[in-house]
Amino acid sequence: MYIFQADQLSAKDTYKLLSGTVIPRPIAFVTTLSSGGAVNAAPFSFYNVVSSDPPLLSISVNRTEGRQKDTARNAVENGEFVVHVSDEAIIEDINETAASLRPDESELTRTSLHPVESKAVSVPGIKEARVRFECKLERHITFDNDQGITTADLLIGRVVCFHLDEKVYDAEKGYILTDELKPASRLAGNHYAKLGEEFTLIRPS
């Protein structure tokens, strides 16, 4: 077995180990509004549910040479953002939004996706996404590396409104139909995955 002390690894090697082993990761497709009114959109796979009561989602946004990305800056300034489930039908468009553009440019111009008005926040959602969560910023936490450089912004959002396409939601039972949702997930590097074979385990009492 290989053993590595974390303080002896480069940032790149640490990223490769974590992103290659903590898999598959759900992909949050996040929209925010810039100060000039541009709809910024970007995908993040350092993402998960924090709590269902209250309904909280976490998104970690890595910085580039200490500089905040548009998503983190906009979310902190406005206190709002919208998280979308990345599915197979739109994952290629979502990948296009990972391009580095100016803050006043909308990544949506690189895609066939369309903004749609939200119900509880000022930030638009994405019409083509089959699940979206309108969020208010609950907490913003920054993290520094061993050199004292701020390298990540953790956004914790409280979901204030859920949007579910009729095809992915069983309204009678209150269940999400994963076979219809077809979520896409992130692996290491440029690799992604579809939902694989499901199996059932009974939780012990």
From Swiss-Prot:
SMART domains: Flavin_Reduct
Keyword Protein biosynthesis among record annotations: no
UniProt keywords, alphabetically: Flavoprotein, FMN
Superkingdom of origin organism: Bacteria
InterPro entries: Flavin_Rdtase-like_dom, Split_barrel_FMN-bd
Record SUPFAM superfamilies: FMN-binding split barrel
A Pfam family assignment: Flavin_Reduct
Keyword field contains Flavoprotein: yes
GO molecular function: FMN binding; oxidoreductase activity, acting on the CH-NH group of donors, NAD or NADP as acceptor
Cofactor(s) named in the record: FMN
Family: Belongs to the flavoredoxin family.
Matching PANTHER family: FLAVIN REDUCTASE LIKE DOMAIN-CONTAINING PROTEIN, FLAVOPROTEIN OXYGENASE
Protein's UniProt name: Uncharacterized protein YwrF
Species the sequence originates in: Bacillus subtilis (strain 168)
Taxonomic lineage of the native organism: Bacteria, Bacillati, Bacillota, Bacilli, Bacillales
Gene, per the UniProt record: ywrF
